[in-house]
UniProtKB/Swiss-Prot annotation:
One of its GO terms (cellular component) is endomembrane system. The gene is RABL2A. It comes from Homo sapiens. Residues 200-228 are annotated as: Disordered. PANTHER family: PTHR47978. Plays an essential role in male fertility, sperm intra-flagellar transport, and tail assembly. Binds, in a GTP-regulated manner, to a specific set of effector proteins including key proteins involved in cilia development and function and delivers them into the growing sperm tail. CDD domains: RabL2. Interacts with IFT27, IFT81, IFT172, ATP6V1E1, HK1, LDHC, MAPRE1 and HSPA2. Expressed in the testis. This is Rab-like protein 2A.
Length: 228
């Protein structure tokens, strides 16, 4: 018997069961451990989806924040970062960013400025966490990293190898993303919402008069567009 192609997967079904959803992106140079951090956090429960068309890996996760079920999409660069720039669609409607550098490779720390500049070009207001990965020597946590201080960004010392601070990092990132989405003042969000509203208005204008008159006779509830 042929498989029913229309049946939603468990991951897709999560969209309907969740109270809300957020998108969290990861930035940083190649081989700083972004994917390893996500896999360490999600462990056996993760189901990565390779989206080669967009040169990214998508990880889906369900979290509970303040009693609500949140569907989280973690976006990983999947090698696209080797070009030192990401496609604009990568940033589209992101609610938080995790920016990673390898504490043992100074060049990855210096490149944070480039990644941060690009992030703010597309997402001026979303919360961003700076992550120092691969802390084999605990003494490195005593070092001062001016980049995070300069931009008033939280700095986490983590290890994908042994799991140090990984769970806290991602749980905090999820909470920041949810809080941002609920209280967003991002100008780009307003622009996207205006464009979506404009498209809806255009569609209504294109409806034939007969259909419009029949729709007027049928009462319907006004549904507010969710804030993204």
């Amino acid at each position: 018997m042929a498989e029913d192609k229309t049946k939603p997967s468990e991951l897709d079904q999560g969209k309907y069961d969740a109270d809300d959803n957020v998108k969290i992106i990861c930035l940083g140079d190649s081989a700083v451990g972004k994917s390893k951090l996500m896999e360490r956090f999600l462990m056996d429960g993760f189901q990565p989806q390779q989206l080669s068309t967009y040169a990214l890996t998508l990880y889906k996760h369900t979290a509970t924040v303040d009693g609500k079920t949140i569907l989280v999409d973690f976006w990983d660069t999947a090698g696209q970062e080797r070009f030192q720039s990401m496609h604009a669609s990568y940033y589209h409607k992101a609610h938080a960013c995790i920016m990673v550098f390898d504490i043992q490779r100074k060049v990855t720390y210096r490149n944070l400025s480039t990644w941060y500049t690009e992030l703010r070009e597309f997402r001026p207001e979303i919360p961003c966490i700076v992550v120092a990965n691969k802390i084999d020597d605990i003494n490195v946590t005593q070092k001062s990293f001016n980049f995070a201080k300069k931009f008033s960004l939280p700095l986490y010392f983590v290890s994908a190898a042994d799991g140090t601070n990984v769970v806290k990092l991602f749980n905090d990132a999820i909470r920041l993303a949810v809080s941002y989405k609920q209280n967003s003042q991002d100008f780009m969000d307003e622009i996207f919402q205006e464009l979506e509203n404009f498209s809806l208005e255009q569609e209504e204008e294109d409806v034939p008069d007969q259909e419009q008159s029949s729709s007027i006779e049928t009462p319907s509830e006004e549904v507010a567009s969710p804030h993204s």
